[in-house]
């Protein structure tokens, strides 16, 4: 998988479920999401034995590992079969990763510029709910070529997701509101 394919898949999916629950809960929620064609998911390094879960789910899903904070986590994620990496920030080993796509985190235009100058064209804006939709629109004016995924405190209602995408985000990451995502998805079908 390359970055363009990942962005395309996430743009189509519109929402990236971010899991922090234990393995059994993650699998239960994924079973509930199956009818809604969720293909791309993020598992965070805070899940106990996350490497085993990545290995297990990477046969059925495009699995990213999130909350990456170190070079050793990058190596562990790749060894487990992760197809992309996500972080709430950025550091040299992450933005220099070439084997699989990365979505480093940023909060300011300067951080986005640093990420872009390193050759990365996709970033996670966190915490987006604090910064707001107008902020995303303003960032897109400055750097229209950057693909921005928003996460952090965003409700997963259809209207909320639509408005973040209209502001310039290509995808909305939902973590604690993943159960609301299920409810919103069930209302659409």
Language-model regions, residue ranges each:
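Conserved N-terminal beta1-alpha1 strand-loop-helix module at the mouth
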Residues: 1-84, 100, 154-158, 166-167, ...
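Conserved anion-binding
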Residues: 49, 69-74, 78-176
């Amino acid at each position: 998988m390359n970055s363009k394919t990942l962005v395309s898949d996430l743009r189509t999916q519109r929402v990236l479920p971010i899991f922090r629950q234990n393995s059994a809960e993650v699998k239960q929620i994924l079973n509930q999401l199956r009818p809604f064609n969720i293909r791309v998911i993020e598992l965070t390094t805070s899940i106990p034995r996350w490497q085993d879960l990545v290995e297990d789910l990477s046969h059925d899903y495009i699995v990213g590992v999130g909350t990456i904070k170190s070079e050793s986590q990058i190596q562990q994620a790749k060894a487990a079969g992760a197809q992309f990496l996500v972080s709430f920030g950025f550091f040299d080993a992450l933005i220099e990763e070439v084997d699989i796509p990365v979505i480093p985190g940023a909060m300011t235009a300067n951080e986005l510029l640093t990420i872009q100058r390193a050759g990365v064209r996709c970033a996670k804006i966190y915490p987006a709910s604090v910064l707001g939709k107008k902020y995303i629109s303003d960032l897109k004016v400055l750097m229209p070529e950057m693909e921005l995924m928003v996460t952090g405190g965003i409700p997963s209602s259809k209207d909320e997701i639509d408005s973040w995408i209209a502001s310039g985000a290509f995808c909305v990451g939902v973590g604690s509101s993943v159960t609301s995502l299920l409810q919103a998805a069930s209302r659409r079908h």
